[in-house]
Curated annotation (Swiss-Prot):
This is D-aspartate oxidase. GO terms for molecular function: D-aspartate oxidase activity; FAD binding. The gene is DAO1. Belongs to the DAMOX/DASOX family. The keyword Kinase does not apply. Its cofactor is FAD. It holds the Pfam family DAO. It is found in: Membrane. It comes from Cryptococcus neoformans var. grubii serotype A (strain H99 / ATCC 208821 / CBS 10515 / FGSC 9487) (Filobasidiella neoformans var. grubii). Glycans are attached at N214. FAD binds at I19, A57, S58, G62, R342, G373, Q375. Keywords: FAD, Flavoprotein, Glycoprotein, Membrane, Oxidoreductase, Transmembrane, Transmembrane helix. One of its GO terms (biological process) is D-amino acid catabolic process.
Amino acid sequence: MSPPLDSSRPVVVIGAGIIGLTTVVCLLESQYYKQYHPPIHIIADYLPNDPLDAKYASTIAGAHHLSFADDGDGRQRNWDLKTFQVMYEQWRQFGEDSGLMALKQTELFVGQMDHLKIYEEHPNFMTLPASMLPPAIDHAVSFTSLTITPSVYLNRLLKQISSLSNGQVKLHRFHLPSLSFLSHPSIKALIGHEPTAGVIVCVGLGALVLGGVNDSLMYPTRGQVVKVRAPWVRSGYTRQIGSLNGGEGGERTYVIPRANGEIILGGTREEGDWYPYPREATTKDILRRAMEICPSLCPANLVAQPLSGTDDRSSTFSSNEQSPSYENPLDSLVIDSLVGFRPSRKGGIRLERGPDLDENTVVIYNYGHGGAGWQSSWGTAEEAVALFCKATRN
């Protein structure tokens, strides 16, 4: 049974990461919104301009569009391809102001002689001949892909939401303890007293503790990365040792340039690890691995002389001063080491209609993207909104 609708009944999206915000944009572009123009409210613990927090993975992500979709996983492939198409068009239209950068991406494989077929859907795909393979690499491909500067992209989404709604979408920082709390007076004071038409749950790891959801299949996959400044690197590299296994297998090393000259180096995949701070040994290991796959990260002058100087004699160290010493020449380029918790879920993304919250409120779930949130965001958002419109017969 579809709930009765009118233009005064609000729709609530819970979560303001990449999944929640793309879902709101798709909702604003839907036939449902065009017909009813309902109030839309975003309720979230974390917002895009907050200080970095491991539990808000969207701003700590690299990020790049690099699908993990297995060849036989048509649903994930479709989500990822849709997202690439949307983002590639945004880059074509707005350039790097979009927070996106198009670049040559090279995938290096150790211990396997094949690649995911979805890479062949990208522009300029090619398999590298054996004569071009770096030492110890068994297989490699390259293609055009995209990297994302998360803070820029998320803020553009906020502006897009404001533009599409004429400023009518309301963003609330509020810790929602349970879905049933949407009927509490403190929430009604924010979203109005009309019955809620629908709730789209985009809470990532919050699904573990959100009452009415309490999804025990959710778990963190800890990722540690190192942010460096190396604007001369404008190509992306990854090295996969062993089976990818849906995105969480083997050892993966990556170099993700951003349009602003920052580079994200990674990484780790530590399932069930809630430690929110960088581990020094991990930082050193990431720097070592990054140099192995992208030696151009560190120009020759840094290898010979850890701290760049000038020809001016006044800038050199006196006999009483010691020149800085680095274990890795990349140390002098490091901005920060960061940790984020990927919102992983046994069985994969939960994207479905759940039981109605009451006889009048549709509930749609869109969470559990693990490390694939950025690369599947638009595809899953579009499907979540389609499920909502179907539930309300729009």
